[in-house]
Curated annotation (Swiss-Prot):
GO terms for molecular function: rRNA binding; structural constituent of ribosome. This is Small ribosomal subunit protein uS19. Keywords: Ribonucleoprotein, Ribosomal protein, RNA-binding, rRNA-binding. The gene is rpsS. Protein S19 forms a complex with S13 that binds strongly to the 16S ribosomal RNA. SUPFAM superfamilies: Ribosomal protein S19. GO terms for biological process: ribosomal small subunit assembly; translation.
Length: 92
């Protein structure tokens, strides 16, 4: 069930403050964050976020098609190594 429109999108305050400060200065430095739950706003376009995936920070460059999604959607937490092929020789 989506979030109510009267509440607005959720964004951590510290993350919004960092983006606003960079927009005022005109900087586009990488912003390191653990806030995977924050919604991407139009103010974030053109910035690069280093989103934590539980092990490391994954760089995510924000473009206009990402607005409305969560930051965590673009930093996968699990690595899929493929299915193991059955070994018919070893089984008896």
């Amino acid at each position: 069930m989506p979030r109510s429109l009267k509440k607005g999108p959720f964004v951590d305050e510290h993350l919004l403050a960092k983006v606003d400060a960079q927009n005022e200065k005109g900087n586009k430095n990488v912003i390191k964050t653990w806030s995977r739950r924050s919604t991407i706003l139009p103010d974030f376009i053109g910035h690069t976020f280093a989103v934590h995936d539980g092990r490391k920070h994954v760089p995510v460059f924000i473009d206009d098609s990402m607005v409305g999604h969560k930051l965590g959607e673009f930093a996968p937490t699990k690595t899929f190594k493929g299915h193991v092929k059955d070994d018919k020789k070893g089984r008896r």
